[in-house]
Structure formats: C-alpha cells, structure tokens
Amino acid sequence: VPGANMPADAQSALDSLVTARVMSETVPGAVYVVFTADGPVFSGSAGVAGGDGRRPCPDTAFRIASCTKSFTAAAVLRLRDAGVLSLDDPVAKFIDIGPCELPGAQSAPQTATIGALLAMSGGLATDNPWADRQESMSEYEFTALCRRGFTLTSAPGTRYEYSNLGYALLGRVIRQASGASYREYVTDSLLRPLGLSHSAFDAAQCTAPGGVTVGFHRVGDQWRPAAVSTPGAFSSIGGLYMTANELAAWCSWLAAGYPWGAIGDDVLAASSRREMQQLHQLDPVRVQGQVRAGGYGYGLEVELHDCGVVVSHRGGYPGFSAQMAWHPETQLGVVILENASYAQTPAVTALRHVLAAAGLPTRSALWPATIAARDEVERLLARWDDAVADRLFADNVDLDLPRQHRRAEIVSAAMRIGFCEECRHRPLASCEPTSTSPANLEWTVTGQRGELRCAITLTSVNPPKVQSITLSSKGSDCQQDRDGGR
C-alpha cells in the first residue's frame, strides 16, 4: 500500500484515537507511527512526555516493554543460523537448572528446549506481576534462581502459556552461546547494524532527539512518575528504550522478510524473520463470543483477523505501554507508544482503521498462469473448444465431471448471461477479483444479459493447470471448490 495513496481520513482516525486516550486520562501521552516497507507514512501524538509539559514526538524514546521479546527471539535465531545452537537444544545445555517438577505427573518432565521457550510453551507459569519487577536482578542472583529449579504448569512443548521467565532464560542462553552479555549482543548484532542508533537498554545511554519519556502510574486521581528499573538479568523480557520511529523501522524490517530476497539478510536472514512470524504454538482466543485463531510465533503474536494475518506484540511495564502491529501481506503497520502502566495500547485497532481506509489489495500476486487461465476460461465461455479445454484442464477435471457434462454446463451458463466474444478482455481489476493464493482466482464474468461468478484453482505441477472450475450466479458461494469440494 503506497504511502502516497493513504487517505487523509486514516490519519484523522488515528489522531482521534490517541487524543481520546489522553482526554479520558487513560494515558498522559501517546505517539503513533504508521509505516510501510518504504518507511514511515505519517505520525501523530497527544498529551505530554513528562512533567515539563512537552509533547511526545516520533523521536521521543519510550520503554517498549515486552516488544523487546522480538529482539530476544531474533538474537536466538541469529545464533541458530550461525550454527552456535539449535532450537532443539535443551535449555539445560547452556544453563545450570535445578529440578523441574510437574505436580501430578507420573514421571519427571524433560527440560524445555530453546524452541519451546521461544514459542511460549516452556511449561512455565504466566508471571507478569512478578517478572515486571525483576529486570534489575543481577546475573549472580539469576544463576541462583535457576539452580533452585522450577514448578511447571504443563509438560514443556505441549501448550501455550505466556512466560517472562522463559525469555529471561533465553537472555542467559544468548549470553552463554555468544560470549557477550545479552544487552551487548543485541546492541552490536541487531540495533547498530540496522541503524537503530538511538535505542538502548539504559535510559542514561538513550540518545533520542526527542528525549526520554517519563513513565507514569495512576495514584488516585493523579499521575505520578513510576519507579525506573535498571538493566539486569531480566532485560531480555522488556528492557529496551526506543523511539516510535525506530520501533517502526524494526517492524518494517521484520515484515520485509516476506518478499523473498529482502534486504538486511546479513543481520538476520529473511527466512528467519518469516519464521518469527509463523504460528508455532496455538492459543485460540475468544473475542465477543467468537473464537479467533491465533497464538505465538517467536517473540511475536500471530492472529487471523477478517483482514488476514496480523503480526503484533503488546508491551506493559511499570510506567509504560506499547504495541506494534503489521499486516504481512501489505507490509503496512502501526506502532503506538504510551507513558502509562499497562494501558492496553490499541495498535491492532489502529491498524484495522488504516487497512480499511487504504483498501486491501488481492492477498497474493497471481501467477501468470492463473491470469492466463482466466482468459482461457472466458474463451471457452464465448465458444467451446476441446483443444482449449485440453491445454487448460488438469487430468482430474474430466474424471470429476465427464467432458460432455462440463461442456453442457459451461455452454448453458454462457447462454444464460449472453456471453460472447465481444464480452471478453475486460480488465481484471474491473471484475471484482478475489484470491487467497497465487494459484486461485474468483472474478465476475459479465455478459449482455447478466453476470456470474467464476472460480478456478490451479495445480503446482508445471505447467500449472486448472484443477477445479466453478460457475455460479453472482452472490452465491464459489468457495467450495477452492476448499477441496467439487
């Protein structure tokens, strides 16, 4: 979605969203950035960044809280790609961990693997209130904590449960595997090579042009500055300070893993960035009575919305809230940073506003063979030709419906709407096309007396051929053939 084509009402909607959160005293201040693969498109802010009344801007640093986990995951995958570790390695290969107990289990559970911790399926309890106060824990104290062992909620690798402790363990794995501290490795291997020069784990080292925001928490009817934790053994769960512009640049780079051959492979391969954005542990959620598919990737949440797959992560920390979200198919995304504790920042809601305003393109670029097949189908509608059918159809088509019956159906449908040679060659964009894959297409066929919907799916065997074709009255469902029905 080119930024130049973004409707003005998209920015108006987001301005209203963040302004309403400040006016309702949900947060003292907020800033957002809308971005595409080409960089920021527009931004806005509301409220204050600190007690001096200054307004936050896209170059003001906030704590991004658990959005930091995407950096932790990327660091692990970078070490994996270098051959230093495997996601199948037990965490105990790198960390001295005491006994792990699963109450009620008949045998001692196995130690979680690195991959299980990345996907939030390490069997550790959800621990937000406790873990958010542990960032400054020393490495010595963390070593002692690990040696005491852990009580598990499930066998590692069997189900989703969000655990900050799991990502603190990954921070230690990075330290042991790389020979550098977690913060040094992320800074030297991810932040600096990507030009994220204003980001830091320590507010005192953050060089954001717009300064560093003061974090607040609510006490009665007043905002009070929140205590600031310093870097330590739990920095890998949520310790980064970033500007909205730099977090948007990070998200844009992650999303750019989708066009094969994307830039930045020297920092982390595009295939590994795509791996972060795949669903590795299912966690269906119920929203307004409806179950929505989703779960956890590696350091990122992955959910299926009505607009398609959305990748995101929310962050909540004493004094700060954050959310980043993007739509991989269009690489259009939103970052929102706020300076209030656990404010449930609404970046996914903002992204839906932007997608609705921009209009969604076809989900995937069609194969040339799919576009050519549409022309051949309309050629058959205008005048049946067995030679055209022979080169168009895969070998299953005549087995699924004998040729004479298929011909009769197509000829009858064409006569019903008055389709002829003069009706062909309408631009595809004017035919209400929809697609869920490069290999399928549904579009409207318009004749002299009416319209119908046509849906085709192609095989992957070269040369791709049509394996199913469905003609239906406009407004009826063509979906069954695309899902495997006949």
Model segments located where?
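Active/ligand-binding-proximal structured segments within catalytic/core domains
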Residues: 72
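Short, conserved catalytic-motif segment at the N-terminal edge
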Residues: 7-64, 84, 100-104, 139, ...
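Short solvent-exposed beta->alpha transition segments
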Residues: 387-435
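Catalytic loop of the DD-peptidase/beta-lactamase superfamily, centered on the K-T-G motif
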Residues: 1-45, 175, 180, 184-188, ...
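A generic structural signal for nonpolar/aromatic side chains embedded in well-ordered alpha-helices
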Residues: 117-118, 145-149, 276, 354
